[in-house]
Amino acid sequence: MATQQTARETHGNYHRSVVVPNQMTRVRRASARAARAISTQLAPELRRHRSLPSDVAVAWAGSRLCGALLGLHGIAGESRAELIDDCIDILEPELCAAFEATGSSKRRALASARRCVRSLMAALPRVQRTLMLDVDAAYERDPAATSRTEIALAYPGIRALCIYRIAHHFHQQRVPLVPRMLTESAHASTGIDIHPGATIGAGCFIDHGTSVVIGETTVIGCDCTLYQGVTLGARRFDRTKGGAIRRGLKRHPTLRDGVTVYANATILGGKTIIGSHSTIAASVLVQESVPSHSTVRPGKNEIVVARSDSSRRSERKSGNSARKSLRRTAR
């Protein structure tokens, strides 16, 4: 038995394998070979990284900041100031690692990280004001909501929007890596995928939220409502003559103020504009612009766009007043 390569130790119902020295040597050699093989297959950009931000730390900082912004700091028995100080301590080294990973020197990365932290702290009151309008929108549009506290604590749409608004600020500051890491942490916990580059106005309500996708160049106005399964995506990708994807172009739709998009609807294309106060019915595919005050619903092998009578009356009134003003000007 003394010459066996492995032995079994028993502690109650728990069994643990014990590896003796000669087998440990073989294991280490095998792991070294695997490490060399893996490193040779990495893309050059990934091979040179020595420091990367931690996804766990970034997600933790985002969650803590959301607690401070939504007034949930009392859960941990901390003051809001203590919570924000803790977030700064967590975020600064992760931001520094992100800048280093994209080519900055340690000194420049640290200076950039501190600048971004100061910028975020200055922006937090504005972010919170917008977030409170999101909470109000959820309370006003969801009859199942019993209180704003319930919404702040339990609604996945609010959590996703809170993380997005923090990430969007970093994205505007051209922070590498961290904005996408923040929104992907929210995606993992809520099922709502919002790119940090998207633009979302105040008073947005994402109800239920599972499988909502909001692309990078999407623009959403104020007081819009999205239900589960909604996709605001790209219709196609423009490419160079060499076949590479063109980046930075408008690929995703624009929703004007007051638009409601029901479950599993898909709106595609950078030139697609949904006019203000329009409604997109469930499970509709929209790839063309829709005028204001319209209802888009599926028909037999077609999409039906119907405009409300009130919008027609308001347009006639505005048209008459415009013609009267033109007559007065002509005189």
Where are the regions a protein language model picked out?
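Terminal amphipathic alpha-helical/low-complexity segments used for targeting or macromolecular assembly
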Residues: M1-E184, R312-R331
